[in-house]
UniProtKB/Swiss-Prot annotation:
Name of encoding gene: CXP;2-1
Similarity comment text for this entry: Belongs to the peptidase S10 family.
PROSITE patterns per record: CARBOXYPEPT_SER_HIS (PS00560), CARBOXYPEPT_SER_SER (PS00131)
Subunit structure: Carboxypeptidase II is a dimer, where each monomer is composed of two chains linked by a disulfide bond.
Gene3D superfamilies: 3.40.50.11320, 6.10.250.940, alpha/beta hydrolase (3.40.50.1820)
SUPFAM superfamilies per record: alpha/beta-Hydrolases (SSF53474)
Alphabetized UniProt keyword annotations: Carboxypeptidase, Disulfide bond, Glycoprotein, Hydrolase, Protease, Zymogen
The protein's name: Serine carboxypeptidase II-1
Keyword Transcription regulation: no
Amino acid sequence: GSDLLTPGDNKTAHDSYAFLVNWLERFPQYKYRDFYIAGESYAGHYVPQLSQLVHRNNKGVRKPILNFKGFMVGNAVIDDYHDFVGTFEYWWTHGLISDDTYQKLQLACEFDSAEHESEACNKINNVAEAEEGLIDAYSIYTPTCKKTSLHRRRLIKGRRPWLPRGYDPCTEQYSTKYYNLPEVQKAFRANVTGIPYSWTACSDVLSDHWKDSPRSMLPIYRELIAAGIRIWVFSGDADSVVPLTATRYSIDALYLPTVTNWYPWYDEEEVAGWCQVYKGLTLVTIRGAGHEVPLHRPQQALKLFEHFLQDKPMPRPAHSIQSF
């Protein structure tokens, strides 16, 4: 319907807020409980925007029903300029694109908006994509879906120690198949109007009509940090779509004082990633994880979520020497 023609960041925040308020009316046992918001990728916009709306609506309320405490985002779009700089740097430093393309990307794109790129930026992005080849951009070191028929996976299991156990690059294909089953749509009370086209994981109809997408979330970060809201940002370091370097440049632009300097955090005596605690924000990286961290590193992701909820920095090894 007309909803498809008027989407945007602002509408998404207000729709989500209306959903939360109505959901709490339906399930009142959850009213007044500590409430956190988390998301990844473009939810780097949705999560801070919804957080800001909840925070502002709670102002002056002594006992808010939506008892908002903090948010967490992963491999998140944060600030278009710094994200572009960090993304192109990641592609080049990880050997995905040529020197020439790297320079041209910097010239053509860095002052564009992520949602509305110029023609020149689009063009050179296509060149970059061709240079990268058929890799999984969301997880640059793991096989792509086409190659992992069950037969092949059995063959390579023993020979490739870097292939994460249990990661299946074909999840998107499965969900596309699943959500197009008539009985599934019926159970969801979806597609009651009999839409002639298939459900897709990423809809062009939506992105083509997207109305508003601010270039930066940093002003919201500043507002919520000042209000004492807990903010954690995490990043899987094998993602080239919203890579760690993009996140680091964006966070650096906040100029927050450091509380605990960069250190490795551990899971079962292995380095699981790195962590830096700033005043008002904690940054955690997850080693070897792609764009969707819990999909690639479920055990480490669980540890991350537990520490976020307890507001405890990520674990160091028992014998670690404090060198800073």
